[in-house]
Amino acid sequence: MKTRRRNVLLGATAIAAAGGLPAPAIAQGVKEFKLVSAYPRDLPGTGTSAERLAQSIAAMSDGRLKLTVYPANSLVRAFEVFDAVSAGAADMYFADEKYFREKSPALNFFASVPYGLTADELCSWILFGGGQALWDEVDAQFNIKPLMALNTGVQMGGWFNKEVNTPEDFKGLRYRMPELGAEVLRRMGATVVTTPADEITGALKSGAIDASEYVGPWPDVWLGLSKVADYYYYPGFHEPGDNSALGINKKLWEGLTTSERAIIETAAQAEVTRSLAEANAENIRALKLLRADTRVKILRFNDDLIRVFGKLSKEVLAETAARDPLTRKVYDSYMAFLAGVMDWGELSETSDRDTRRLALA
């Protein structure tokens, strides 16, 4: 099967190189698309959102646009979806673009970076701060048109099989952590691994890894992480608001009508709002279950660790920006917007939450 998949990708790449124009399958006026997801079909949030997005697009188009969702490892492996769509072997993907940072380090900024923009701030930058134009510029290099499609909000710091209180506690720790957050941990001496969502629980249970972040209480409980690790840390410094993308083959996108593109854009933006609202509501319910489990200890990373995370995060982001001119351009725009929302936030949301806590104590 792996050999066949490689052949499919190689064949699609050859077609693209020869100038072939990807086009949806059309039957009786219905355009059919293959959407490959980086997530298991039933995984709460990321997996279920892909299905819901496909249903929304079908409903909004009166059935004229039909997306068939292929969950992770069915048509292609989870981390191969970008290449599949780029080459034309699939039409669209649903994935966190940090997974594909080796294509361009700039992709990190359109998903989530340590101590970066929160979910609503990221939406503001992409929609009204110049982020979408930069994202289009980055992904166009790979024949991709990107759209925001999901946000799971602030992440948790992860599940551990022991307490961590000092930077030394991270030395030698086998930790499942994505992308730029992983680089922060490497500099603290951790051994960082990349593990697909459906393999995390087994890896923790077997002792192959000592700790793992994933998302938050809702999907973490569904995966069974609370059954195989006792210590649940917050906050997730590495992902303050994680965005997943709907990536569309660019040549295919350009061949759609204005109406069809508007339907897909509107459905994707609606799914961002819906997914974030759902994550907040379901995390509340799942957190109650975790608090009721006397074995699970929910702990905050102490101030000393947070300072170390912050210092190393600044270094990692600056070094990432220096990788190439386009990434520097994205970084400069992102950081300028971050400075602005932090300034405004001190007078608005941060102030409101602080005073609300005081008023309702």
Regions found by a protein language model. Give the residues of each.
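N-terminal secretory/targeting leader peptides
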Residues: 2-3, 9-19, 26-122, 132-133, ...
